[in-house]
Amino acid sequence: VRSSAASDVYKRQLLAPFTGAGQWMSGDNYGRVTSGTAVALLGRVRVLYASPLFNRSNDLSRWTQAYNDIKRSIDVLTAAGYGLANESNPGVNASGWANLFTEVPSQEAVFVTLHNTLTEGVPDYRKNNTWENGIRPYNARGGGGKTPSAMLVDMFPMSDGKIPATCETYNTLTKSDIPYYREFPFVDRDPRFYRTFAFPGVRWSFVGNPTTQGNRYPHNGPDYELWNYTWYTDAAYVDDIEANSSVTYGADGLLNDVKGFYVRKRSDDRDVNAIARYVYDEKSGGFTRSAAPYMEIRYAEVLLNYAEAACNAGEMGVAVDQLQKIRARVGYKAENNYGLEAGLDGDQAKCMAAIMYERQIELAYEGKRFDDMRRWMLFDGGI
C-alpha cells in the first residue's frame, strides 16, 4: 500500500501542470491540485509511515526518507509561490494568522477545498461551508457554537510562549513563569489563543443585523460582542460542567443555549476579513451560505511535518528552525527565541515534545489531532 501511495503521488506530481507563476493562484483554476500539492501529500504519507503505528522498531531510514522528501518538497513549494501567509504582518493578537483561513487566494493553501454561497437549484450546485454557522453563538443567528475542551484552553501557551505551569502534559518542556489562573484563562496567552477561542467580552464582528428578529438578538453584526455570562436556577449546579440546560440561563438572549467558551478558530471575522465569504440570512439561515475555503494541507503543516521528520532523523537544528518560523508569524521575536526554550536542538526528546505541542496549538480544530494521536499511539499512553 505504501509503495502504491508513493507511486500515485509521484505520478500526480509529474502530471499536475504549472502555470507561469508555478501554481494555480487565480481565476477558475485556483484550488486545483498542483505538483506542490502532490509533494506535500507525499511528505504527510512519509511521516505517517515513519511513525510508531507503522514503525514499531523505529527504523531510522524511514525518518531519513521522510526528511529528504519533505526537504525537496519545500523547494518545489517555494518555487511555486507557497509559503506562510501574512508572515510579515502578525497584526494584533495574530489577526494576520486568523485571516489566512478565509483569504482567497492564499499562498498558505497547498491543498484547498473551495465552497460557494449558492442556494438550492436545478441542477443543485450548492457547496456551502457550514463551519461559520456552527461556531457562531445563537444570539448572532448562528447554530449555537462549538465548545472547546477545558484541557485545550488550559494548555495553550502563555504570552512568553511556554506551556502553563499548571498543565500536566508535555512534562519534558520547561513551564512558563507567568501565573495561570483558571478563573481568568484569557490573561497573558499566546496570540493564537484569542483567535482560537471566544469568551466573555470578545468582539466578534460580522456582516448582518439580526436585531430585527427580536430581543434574543441584541447586537447588530458590526458591533457584536459576546457576553456569555451564565446564571443558574439552582446554586447546586454551579460547578457541574454536565449541568442540564434547564438550570442554566445565559445573558444577551443566549438563554439555555449559552456556553462558557466558544471555538473561534477559522472564523470569518469582519474585523479580520473585510469581505465576508458568507451571505447572511437574519431570518433563518444565519451563516449557512458560506464560501469560506477549507485547507486540508496548509504550508504550516508542511513545516511541522518537516520539523518532525528532521527531529527524528537527527537534524534537530532544522526542526527548531521550522518552529521558529511558525512562531514568528504570530508575533514572537528572536530576542526571546520565539517563545521556545533554549537547547531544543541538543535534546531530541524535548525537541519532539515541542513539535507535538506546536502541532496541537497551531493546527487546533483543523482535523489533525486524531491522526497525530493514532500514529504516535498516544491513546494508550504513548510508546
Where would I find each of the regions flagged by the language model?
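Extended substrate-binding grooves/exosites of carbohydrate-active enzymes
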Residues: G145-S159
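Acidic/polar-rich alpha-helix caps and helix-coil junctions
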Residues: V1-G144, D160-I383
